[in-house]
């Protein structure tokens, strides 16, 4: 989940430094990391250069990883994670290409696997701490399909139509699917310019309230099961939306719940920071350095600060989906 990834920083060089302060060193912060005739480089020198916030972020990441792994290791199947990674490797054209992509991001395959495990632990934490009733799940989700006719943002764009032609085409398709709603998937596969959903008969799966842009969402949640919308305009183009029959609701319920929890946390980061605080209290986490404690409480565990970061990162616009959860 994106929000949690913003909070949990990667454990990189600073983690190695913190390791030097631990089992392989004495309690003094003046441990020598590198010696030379010109002078030594000590742990204290590097920590001063790095800054308290970076050290706090990395320290918190390490301790949280340990605590989450201890609490939820029996609830996360690493075989499922391995299967997911195999699928991703295939999508990238093989293991070598996938590892090359990770290397460009400063990660090894083992690092990536650990990150996915941490994400799975975080999801378990939120399932424990964030309440979502069956009624909420029903009221805030709809199984959805759509057909998209894209509008060119500029004349040189290879994909899409002019606004006028896109609207005319969408209106023509809308009349066709309104007459033959059972052929929606067939028509979506042929006409939709959203290639990823067109391959699945236009299916977007279960859409959660707050996940899509307002105009799309308002039209969708007015529909009864099996109904088709009028033409809906978004920044992407013109959509025809269908509320699909939810024959698989019970089997998909846990996935829908997870999506809804993520959407809740995206809107209210305090749910996540409170969950972290409860977990840290349960495991008697004790900050030995007052400055590090303050840095963690003022940034990582401050929901207002997280909200500010979210707003800064979302200023560039987000297309059809609002949060990208």
Curated annotation (Swiss-Prot):
Known catalytic reactions: [protein]-peptidylproline (omega=180) = [protein]-peptidylproline (omega=0)
Keyword Membrane: yes
EC numbers: 5.2.1.8
GO annotation (BP), single: protein folding
Signal peptide feature range: 1-20
Domain PpiC: 139-245
InterPro entries the UniProt entry points to: Foldase_PrsA (IPR023059), PPIase_dom_sf (IPR046357), PPIase_PpiC (IPR000297), PrsA_foldase (IPR050245), Trigger_fact/SurA_dom_sf (IPR027304)
Residues carrying lipid (S-diacylglycerol cysteine): 21
UniProt GO molecular function: peptidyl-prolyl cis-trans isomerase activity
Lipid anchor positions (N-palmitoyl cysteine): 21
Renumbered residue ranges of the record's region Disordered: 159-200, 303-325
Subcellular location: Cell membrane
GO cellular component: plasma membrane
Primary localization class, coarse: membrane
PANTHER family xrefs: FOLDASE PROTEIN PRSA (PTHR47245:SF1), PEPTIDYLPROLYL ISOMERASE (PTHR47245)
Name of the protein in its database record: Foldase protein PrsA
Annotated source species: Staphylococcus epidermidis (strain ATCC 35984 / DSM 28319 / BCRC 17069 / CCUG 31568 / BM 3577 / RP62A)
Gene that produces this protein: prsA
């Amino acid at each position: 989940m994106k929000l949690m990834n913003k909070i949990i920083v990667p454990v990189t060089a600073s983690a190695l430094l913190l390791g030097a302060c631990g089992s392989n060193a004495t309690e003094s912060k003046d441990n020598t990391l590198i010696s030379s005739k010109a002078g030594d480089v000590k742990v204290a020198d590097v920590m001063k250069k790095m800054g308290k916030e970076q050290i706090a972020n990395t320290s918190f990441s390490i301790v949280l990883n340990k605590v989450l792994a201890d609490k939820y290791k029996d609830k996360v199947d690493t075989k499922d994670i391995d299967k997911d990674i195999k699928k991703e490797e295939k999508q990238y054209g093989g293991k070598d290409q996938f590892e090359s992509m990770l290397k460009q991001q400063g990660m090894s395959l083992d690092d990536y696997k650990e990150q996915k495990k941490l994400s799975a632990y975080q999801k378990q934490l939120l399932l424990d701490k964030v309440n979502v009733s069956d009624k909420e799940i029903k009221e805030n989700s709809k199984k959805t399909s759509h057909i998209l006719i894209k509008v060119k943002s500029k004349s040189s764009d290879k994909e899409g139509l002019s606004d006028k032609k896109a609207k005319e085409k969408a209106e023509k398709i809308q009349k066709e699917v309104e007459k033959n709603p059972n052929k929606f998937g067939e028509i979506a596969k042929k006409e939709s310019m959203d290639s990823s959903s067109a391959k699945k008969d236009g299916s977007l799966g279960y859409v959660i309230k707050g996940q899509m842009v307002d105009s799309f969402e308002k039209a969708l949640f007015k529909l009864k099961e099996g109904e088709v919308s009028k033409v809906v305009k978004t920044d992407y183009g013109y959509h025809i939306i269908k509320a699909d029959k939810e024959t698989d609701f019970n089997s998909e319920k846990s996935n829908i719940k997870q999506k809804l929890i993520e959407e809740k946390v995206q809107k209210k980061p305090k749910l996540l920071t409170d969950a972290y605080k409860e977990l840290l209290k349960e495991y008697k986490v004790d900050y030995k350095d007052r400055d590090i404690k303050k840095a963690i409480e003022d940034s990582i565990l401050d929901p207002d600060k997280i909200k500010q970061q979210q707003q800064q990162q979302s200023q560039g616009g987000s297309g059809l989906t609002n949060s990208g959860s």
